[in-house]
């Protein structure tokens, strides 16, 4: 399993609109992507920082999303996000929610 972490700096007082755009616009796009597993989004208590972690079956499908659909997602969120979101990628080592165990390495 593979993860994308996207860090965003939110515009002031934009959390309600950010949440609405995620639910109505972004999540439906994600659900259509091959290999998409789950999305978890966190908003800081001050309401100016957020990050989202999307889980994918494999890196190739996450990369296809990154090249194809992600620019559209960034455009959807541009009204509530300041600057350019920072994207990092990871291999998932463990998840109790998804019952994943990392493969043993020699």
Residue ranges and their predicted role:
Residues 1-51, 55-71, 78-106:
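Short S/T/G/P-rich N-terminal loop/turn motif that feeds into the first structured element of a domain
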């Amino acid at each position: 399993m593979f993860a994308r972490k996207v860090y965003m700096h939110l515009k002031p007082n934009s959390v309600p609109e950010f949440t609405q755009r995620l639910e109505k616009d972004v999540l439906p796009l994600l659900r259509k992507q091959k290999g998409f597993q789950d999305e978890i989004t966190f908003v800081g208590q001050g309401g100016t920082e957020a990050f989202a972690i999307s889980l994918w079956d494999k890196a190739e499908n996450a990369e296809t999303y990154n090249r194809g659909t992600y620019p559209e997602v960034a455009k959807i969120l541009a009204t509530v996000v300041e600057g350019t979101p920072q994207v990092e990628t990871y291999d998932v080592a463990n998840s109790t929610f998804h019952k994943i165990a990392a493969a043993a390495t020699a």
